[in-house]
Amino acid sequence: FDFMHFTQTRIATIDIYAVFFLLLMYDAMVLFLRKDLTVAPLKKLLPPLLACGVFTGLGIASKWTAAYGALGLAVLFFGKLAFTLLAEKREGRELRPLWKKCGLLCLWCCLFFLVIPFGIYFAAFLPLTTLPHNVERLWDTFVNYQTTMFNYHSQLKAEHYFASPWYEWPFDIRPIWYFASDACNAAGEYSTIAALGNPLLWIVSFLALIAAVRQLWHGIRRPAAVAAVGFLSVYLPWTLVPRL
């Protein structure tokens, strides 16, 4: 049970949808990673990638931060191709059929991870872009929404007393305090809302991450790769954000 997830769902933030689809994105990618590229036909390899692309589109349509996780998917996908090719080369096997299959997979992924996610993302704005005063300039309105959102977040100058640097987050050193009521009720009680992770889960998870990175250092392990890449892809980009 994670306290932060409980709080975020109760105050109805969109982060919960992004996290949900991020989990589905990586679940679908794991299904692909379990396939043997050397023997599995293309029709068996494509369904998990299609599902992964759909979930990616839904995640990014929910919140841009899901795009960070999509970078991790790319690392896992191309890593799978590269290590399979290297393994076959070490065995001295003919690589031409495998290269052809990898090329076809990459072409299909242009549809699954570019066209389809963009279509889903674009469709998410249709309730706004198809309003009577927007419908005649639908594309311009769509682009304007993107630039407005980007400019707002990139130029926002805001501080929060309970903000904390990114390197403190895994240890739950300074939980964020969202709200406190001005006056107490008849029983002398105040209302307050705070978001913090379950210290047991977060600290143990951080130790598990270290173990996963250590396994990767000593040799590729698929579960370790998924855990490490998945976490770092959504965590490290925040090191570049000055406003936390």
Regions found by a protein language model. Give the residues of each.
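Membrane-interface helix-loop-helix junctions at transmembrane boundaries of multi-pass membrane enzymes
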Residues: 42-43, 85-108, 208-229
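Transmembrane-embedded, aromatic-rich helix segments that form part
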Residues: 19, 65-87
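Membrane-interface alpha helices of multi-pass inner-membrane proteins
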Residues: 41-63, 235
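Short acidic/glycine- and proline-prone juxtamembrane loop motifs at membrane-interface regions
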Residues: 4-17, 62-65
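Transmembrane-helix signature of polytopic, lipid-linked glycan biosynthesis machinery
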Residues: 60, 215, 232-244
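Hydrophobic, aromatic-rich transmembrane alpha-helices
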Residues: 182-186, 191-221
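Membrane-interface transmembrane helices that cradle and orient dolichyl/undecaprenyl
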Residues: 25-48, 78-88
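Aromatic-rich transmembrane-lumenal/periplasmic boundary elements in polytopic membrane proteins
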Residues: 98-101, 108, 117-172
